[in-house]
Each structure stands twice: as structure tokens, then as C-alpha cells.
Curated annotation (Swiss-Prot):
GO cellular component: cytoplasm
Catalytic function, reaction form: tRNA(Ser) + L-serine + ATP = L-seryl-tRNA(Ser) + AMP + diphosphate + H(+); tRNA(Sec) + L-serine + ATP = L-seryl-tRNA(Sec) + AMP + diphosphate + H(+)
Species of origin: Acidiphilium cryptum (strain JF-5)
Pfam families: Seryl_tRNA_N, tRNA-synt_2b
Subunit structure: Homodimer. The tRNA molecule binds across the dimer.
Alphabetically ordered keywords of this record: Aminoacyl-tRNA synthetase, ATP-binding, Cytoplasm, Ligase, Nucleotide-binding, Protein biosynthesis
Pathway: Aminoacyl-tRNA biosynthesis; selenocysteinyl-tRNA(Sec) biosynthesis; L-seryl-tRNA(Sec) from L-serine and tRNA(Sec): step 1/1
Compartments, record wording: Cytoplasm
Name used for this protein in its record: Serine--tRNA ligase
Gene giving rise to this polypeptide: serS
Annotated binding of ATP, by residue: R267, S268, E269, E354, I355, S356, S357
UniProt-annotated binding residues for L-serine: T236, A237, E238, E290, S394
Protein family membership: Belongs to the class-II aminoacyl-tRNA synthetase family. Type-1 seryl-tRNA synthetase subfamily.
PROSITE patterns named among the record's database cross-references: AA_TRNA_LIGASE_II
GO biological process, one term: seryl-tRNA aminoacylation
Amino acid sequence: MHDLKAIRDDAAAFGAAMRRRGLAGPEGADEGAAAPIRALDEERRRAQTELQGHETRRNELARAIGQAKRAGEDTTALEAEGTALRQSIETANAWLAESARKLDELLAVLPNVLDADVPDGPDETANVEQKRVGAPPSFDFEARQHFELGEALGLMDFAGAAKLAGARFTVLRGDLARLERALGQFMLDLHVNEHGYTEVSPPLLVNDATMYGTGQLPKFAEDLFRTTDGRWLIPTAEVPLTNLAAGEILDAASLPLRMTALTPSFRSEAGSAGRDTRGMLRQHQFWKVELVSLTTPEASADEHERMTSCAESVLERLGLPYRRMLLCAGDTGFSSAKTYDLEVWLPGQGAYREISSCSNCRAFQARRMNARYRPPQTGPKPAKPDFVHTLNGSGVATGRALIAVMENYQNADGSITVPDALRPYMRGCDRIG
């Protein structure tokens, strides 16, 4: 959600910020997407001023009627005016309530303002590579994709999953199921024991307000799964973890608040028809380790770098080649002000593919869910609460990490070497197949 006062104070700047996102606003409006917001806001402010005048006059009439009655004077005209005023006040209050709802609707579907250092560009082709870590493996055989390896081993069953649930699901068996579980446990242990995150086990079903708080609703309902009782399956643990602060005022001394969770994630992939139809890259259900941080406005940029480094350490411990990408304006997510994607090398595809996104959402989500903190007191009175900054990142997607391990650690005979970091979680198993 956006700060209405900031839009009011500089509608042109807000309009320019939305144009970076590809939102031009009404034709001919210099203020762009801010124009309808500012127009409705100004109309509301005029109506509020008029309402205050009506309420003042109503109070004056009440006193005048009382005085007239005590003096034995006729109050018919005064009472008629009072009746008309009550109707005007009721009408004005109803309009203000409806216009407030419309204003919220206008604001709720506008994306976050991007940081100044986010590059312009329409889509992923304009993303900027910042660094590469690790060299892609060199095989003396033709690298196979993960689904070819998994099916040949008899440990990855797409036909069985389709029988149970339809397309974009997978059944893992035996050592591949163990390997996926090992990846999740390894990541959790790393983030908790070395990076200072607190493990949380959150609900997988949440309500409308929770989805609204992190920005999934109202704009992206078609990307989500909804139950018959109106709850939503979480698309990422970011949703419940971040919303734990909804409506709270946190003590500044408790920040940064760092949380992690290993949960299933559920996505309809409504806009992905025809993309990655084979294998596990794009699933309706997948496991993911999520990282969430709540911090002060002054610390959020550094926290973003730290969180991204924590996610990178997973790939480095696993010996997986990757690159860090700074997303451009057209590829940055709705709630994010700045996002880094980590892309892991997949030899079977001969390409880097996303395995983690780490985003600084600034105060955007906090304003939607009213998550605040109280700065340290510096004067005679307690400091006024301010919105926290929220950050989230994959630390990392477990299913995609499984794919990356399979493809980067494959052998000529179709077996898979287990990375050293995972062997303690595999009871010493060093090879699958």
C-alpha cells in the first residue's frame, strides 16, 4: 500500500514511479496513475470539510432549539432545518465510506515504488547480471535433464502423480525423496545455526486479510488456490511469516526480526501455460525454505544484502554454480522495491534458472498490514510508531535445488553423487543409483 500523503504532496513523482512499472494512467494526465487517486482524494477532502460544516451547524441548531423551547418560541423552522441536516450528514457519511473503499481499491492494485538503482526495462531481458560464482561442470558425456535421470532411476514418477492430481505434480521415491528432505533440513540448519534465523512452523491456510497484507490479494487471486470455506493455500511462507507482525507495534530493540520456515507452497501457475511442462521446474506444489526479515527503514538495504548472501551460501555449500541478477523494473514483483534473483546452472538445459528471489519491500507490505515499530525514545515523550520494512527471500526452493543437484552431480552411468554437505542427512549415502 502507498502513503496517500506522499501522493498528495507530489503526485507527479508518484506518477513517474508508476510509469517505470508500465502504468501510464489516464491519457493526457501529467500525474499518470496518481491522477484518479488525487482527484478522488481531493473530492473526499472537500466532502469532509462540508460534513464538518454540517456537524457544526447541527450543534448550533441543537442549542438554538433548546433556547427557543425554554423561551416558548416556535421551533418548527429550526427543527425542519435540523432534519434536513441529519439527512445530509447521513448521505455524506455514506458517500465518504464508499469513496474510502474506492480509494483503497485504487491504491491496493498499484505496485510498490522501485528503488532508484533498479534498472529500467520491460522484462527479464533487461535484468543485470551482478556476479557469477562457480564454473559449470564439464562432462565427457551428454548431460541429461533431471526428469530423464529421475525416471531412469525409477525414483521420479510423473505418470503416477498425474493419476493422483493431474499435471504439474511429481511423486518422488526412495533416495530422491530422501535427498529432497535432506536439502530442506540442511538449509534450515544453516539458516538457524549460522545465520541467526528463528525457525517457525506456520499455517498453510490463511485468510483474506493475510493474503492482502503481503500483496497477493486482490490483484493475483487467479494465481492462488482457494478452499471452499474461503481460506487460501499459501504460495510461499512469506505470507504467514510476514503477517505475524500485522497490527503489531514492535520494540526497536527486537529488530531485526529474522524468521525461516520450510513449507509446501501452492501456486496455480495460471500464466504459465506451455512453459516448463516437463519435470519439476514449475509445479503446483513444491517445498521451499523461506527467509523473512523485519527491520528499520535505515537498516533494510543492508539487510537485503545480508539475506541474499545467506541464500547464496546454500548454493556455495552445495557446490552449485550460480549467478546473481538485479531485476529490472518490468520484472520486479508487485510488492518489491528491489529484487535479486539467484539463478543456478542446469547442465541438462545448458542454462541458468531461477532458484531464489530476495526482495526488499520497504514499508509497502507493512502499511497494508499495519506492522509498526517504536523507535528509541530521544526526547521527553515516547517516539511515534513507524512502519517496519519487510524483506523476504527463498533460502532456497527445495525442489529446484534437487533439480540442480541431480543435473550438476550426474555421472555417465546415470547415477547421482550426493554433495558432501548433504551426506550427514543421508546417513552417509554418497551415491544414488
